[in-house]
């Protein structure tokens, strides 16, 4: 299997305030998906047992891929979608990190249904409830 350029621990962090999505490989070869403003710091937390419970006792852990994605909302949406993908998809992402932009863009597009025009109510339904529409 070809090694990714991300198999070595990265030495740079994303710009301050920017969120990243990352993949960590466990000793058993499983891939864990997470988000952080500092993936390297987060990896160290995972390695020390102070990170996600899912990774405790699963080391050694290796950060195999990371991508700066912007704000926390975008990071959460992308994390959710990436966690739904197969391991084969994630392995391909590790091997071909340049394809991330193509794959992730549709995940950030929020599709909202078109608004329907308000329905006009019949005239008799406009009167207040409890009113008999008589002048008194």
UniProtKB/Swiss-Prot annotation:
Cross-referenced InterPro entries: GIY-YIG_endonuc (IPR000305), GIY-YIG_endonuc_sf (IPR035901), UPF0213_domain (IPR050190), UPF0213_GIY-YIG_endonuc (IPR022992)
CDD domains in UniProt: GIY-YIG_UPF0213
PROSITE patterns per the UniProt record, alphabetical: GIY_YIG
Domain GIY-YIG as annotated: residue spans: 17-92
A Pfam family the protein falls into: GIY-YIG
Family indicated by similarity: Belongs to the UPF0213 family.
Alphabetized PANTHER family for the sequence: UPF0213 PROTEIN YHBQ
Protein name stated in the entry: UPF0213 protein ASA_0550
Organism: Aeromonas salmonicida (strain A449)
Lineage of source species: Bacteria, Pseudomonadati, Pseudomonadota, Gammaproteobacteria, Aeromonadales
């Amino acid at each position: 299997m070809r090694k990714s350029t991300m198999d070595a621990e990265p030495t740079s962090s994303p710009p301050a305030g920017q969120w990243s999505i990352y993949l960590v490989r466990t000793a058993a070869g499983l891939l864990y998906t997470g988000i952080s403003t500092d993936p390297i710091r987060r990896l160290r937390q995972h390695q020390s047992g102070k990170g996600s419970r899912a990774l405790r006792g699963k080391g050694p852990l290796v950060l195999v891929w990371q991508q700066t994605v912007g704000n926390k909302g975008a990071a959460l949406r992308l994390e959710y979608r990436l966690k739904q993908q197969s391991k084969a998809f994630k392995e391909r992402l590790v091997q071909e990190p340049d394809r991330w932009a193509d794959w992730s863009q549709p995940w950030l597009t929020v599709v909202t249904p078109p608004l329907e025009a308000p329905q006009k109510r019949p005239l008799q339904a406009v009167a207040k409830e409890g009113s008999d529409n008589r002048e008194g």
